[in-house]
């Protein structure tokens, strides 16, 4: 075999499509499970090239990939590392510089991908960055890039301004962290089952699929827009409401959302 890709089972759909397009031999490991990743890399030694593909922050749970351990294994088994920073860039790390800042893996990751549709202004489009040789090759041979329209100048301009703001001022990022901690702590104190998070994603676990949809619909009636996820988007029996916090949320808005969660929770028997 020529190449192989080992990827986390909770990876984004874009990584799934990318692995399919590159026709590499596929290996999958359980979410953030380094023992399984090591077994995948051992099996992949027969291939000439190996790449580990992971999200920086996993979109359904909000947990962070252990990038330092992933990079250690990549060096041990001579593999490239690709991380999708869509949910982590602008959010994770002391200054919002993503999982490489949080895990101190600058210079150890070969390819970064990300989106302009989340922390960087909520527009559309995305980016890939890495060593010049890799980017030059992608410019010439990446079909999704080659045969897509260019982004509008207004989107590029706005996104560059967001990059500049994040680099010069940490106050927006600090406000986001405060909001996430406040919402999570208040929700847990109210009795909700919240997944541990180091990101702006807060997963309120309900486990029952129909309940997650009824809950989301009732919250919308209360003026709170959230999404209920269930199988096949998440594993069976792992239905949840995903809440994404923003630096733009005021304390009053967060209190309104928490009050609505509690009210509906009591109505539907989630809270006693």
Protein language model regions, located:
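Active-site phosphate-binding strand-loop segment of PLP-dependent enzymes
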Residues: 27-83
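PLP-dependent enzyme catalytic core of the Aspartate aminotransferase-like
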Residues: 221-224, 232-272
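Helix C-cap/helix->beta junction micro-motif
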Residues: 22, 76-77, 190, 222, ...
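Active-site-proximal loop->helix
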Residues: 14-23
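Conserved PLP-binding catalytic core of the aspartate aminotransferase-like
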Residues: 174-183, 188-223, 233, 237-238, ...
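Active-site C-terminal subdomain of aminotransferase-like
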Residues: 77-80, 87, 92-198, 211
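Single conserved hydrophobic/aromatic residue that forms the stacking wall/gate
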Residues: 1-6, 10
């Amino acid at each position: 075999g020529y190449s192989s890709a080992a990827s986390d089972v909770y990876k984004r759909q874009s990584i799934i499509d990318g692995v399919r397009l590159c026709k590499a031999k596929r290996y999958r490991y359980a979410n953030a499970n380094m023992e399984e990743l090591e077994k995948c890399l051992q099996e992949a030694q027969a291939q000439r090239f190996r790449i580990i593909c992971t999200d920086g922050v996993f979109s359904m749970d909000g947990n962070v990939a252990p990038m330092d351990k992933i990079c250690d294994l990549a060096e041990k088994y001579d593999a490239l590392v690709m991380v999708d920073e869509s949910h982590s860039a602008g959010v994770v790390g002391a200054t919002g510089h993503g999982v490489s800042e949080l895990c101190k893996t600058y210079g150890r990751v070969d390819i970064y991908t990300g989106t302009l549709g989340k922390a960087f202004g909520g527009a559309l489009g995305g980016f890939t960055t890495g060593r010049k040789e890799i980017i030059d090759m992608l410019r010439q041979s990446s079909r999704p890039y080659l045969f897509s329209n260019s982004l509008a100048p207004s989107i590029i301009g706005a996104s560059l301004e967001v990059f500049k703001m994040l680099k010069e001022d940490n106050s927006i990022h600090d406000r986001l962290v405060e909001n996430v901690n406040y919402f999570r702590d208040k929700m847990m104190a109210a009795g909700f089952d919240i997944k541990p998070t180091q990101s702006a994603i807060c997963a309120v676990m309900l486990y029952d699929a129909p309940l997650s949809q009824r809950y989301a619909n009732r919250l919308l009636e209360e003026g709170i827009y959230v999404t209920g996820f269930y199988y096949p988007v998440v594993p069976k029996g792992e239905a949840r409401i995903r809440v994404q916090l923003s630096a733009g949320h005021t304390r009053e808005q967060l209190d309104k959302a928490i009050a609505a969660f509690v009210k509906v929770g009591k109505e539907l028997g989630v809270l006693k």
